């Protein structure tokens, strides 16, 4: 059985941070002090969802409730990439085991399960919030290999993460607009 390490944001679904910033009245070019730290701390599991919401309440300086912050944060996740969906279906038809390999947080893990039509077919995952580090950290790649072994293919949209995979000897491919179609064509050949 072949193994795919699959990033989520920018590969399985579109990310729309601009909608989050708009909902919180934040300027993405001039984020308030503490925003990036709170984001990273949440992404690596240093703080939980409640603390993240409280931190954002203080950072935003507005009277947003935890529920409003949650709703705004969920706007980060947009729509499923149907080209990726078709690629995954073809891989499953050929017996591939697919594992999510993503920098993400509990709220987004919960949300992507509602957005991705195939999410229940991918119960296995390595998430940054569980590992305590983000890609391209060695800790993420090591955690994946210790649990699942070295993947036959790794797809990610971020070049720095692809470079991290290559450093670990992975067959890493940067995901672009045409990657899913190219891989589908190769599978049919």
Residue ranges of model-derived segments:
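A short secondary-structure junction motif
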Residues: 41-49, 114
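Substrate-recognition element of Asp-dependent hydrolases with the DxDx(T/V) motif
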Residues: 66-113
């Amino acid at each position: 059985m072949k193994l795919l390490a699959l990033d989520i944001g920018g590969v399985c679904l579109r990310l729309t941070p601009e909608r989050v910033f708009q909902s919180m009245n934040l300027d993405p070019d001039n984020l308030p002090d503490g925003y990036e730290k709170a984001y990273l701390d949440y992404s690596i599991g240093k703080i939980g969802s409640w603390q993240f919401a409280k931190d954002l309440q203080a950072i935003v300086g507005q009277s947003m409730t935890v529920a409003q912050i949650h709703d705004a944060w969920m706007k980060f996740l947009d729509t499923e990439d149907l080209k990726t969906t078709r690629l995954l279906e073809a891989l499953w038809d050929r017996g591939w085991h697919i594992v999510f390999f993503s920098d993400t947080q509990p709220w987004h893990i919960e949300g992507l399960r509602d957005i991705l039509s195939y999410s229940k077919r991918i119960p296995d995952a390595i998430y940054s919030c569980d590992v305590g580090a983000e890609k391209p950290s060695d800790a993420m790649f090591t955690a994946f290999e210790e649990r699942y072994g070295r993947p036959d293919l790794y797809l990610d949209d971020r070049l720095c993460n692809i470079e991290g995979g290559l450093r670990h000897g992975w067959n890493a491919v940067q995901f672009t607009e045409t990657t899913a179609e190219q891989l589908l064509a190769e599978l049919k050949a």
